[in-house]
Amino acid sequence: MSNPPTVPRQTQPTFLFVCKDGPTAPEKRIEHLAGHLAHVEAHWQSYVTAGPLKAPGSSKIHGSCLIVCADDVDAAWAIMRGDPYFTCDMFESVEVHDMTMSIGLYPGGKIWESLDSVRERANGG
C-alpha cells in the first residue's frame, strides 16, 4: 500500500454530530423519513457524510452520525434544526464535536508533513 499524499488542511470548519436514538425513535424515524430525506438532499453539499448507526452485525438502527461543514457551530446547528429528525425529538442525546479531517479518502491524503508538525499542533501550536 502506498503512502498517502500530503494535502492542504481544509479551511472550513467541520462538525461531527453523534445522535443516540430515544425510545420512540423507530416510529419517528419512519414517520419523518420523507421529510428527513428531503432536508438532507436539499443540504447535501454541507455534509461530508451522514448515515444511521447500528451495532456490528445488527440491522437495528440505534442512532445517527452526521459530519457537516459549516462556518461555525451555530451554522451547523441551523442545518440540523431544519431536519425533521431533529425537530421531532427523536434523539435521546446529541453530541457535537469540532473535527479536523486529518487523513482519508475525503481529504485526499493526510494534512501533516511530519511527526513534529503533528506534535506541535497537538500541544496547541
Mark where each language-model region is.
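Conserved, structured core segments of small domains
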Residues: 2-125
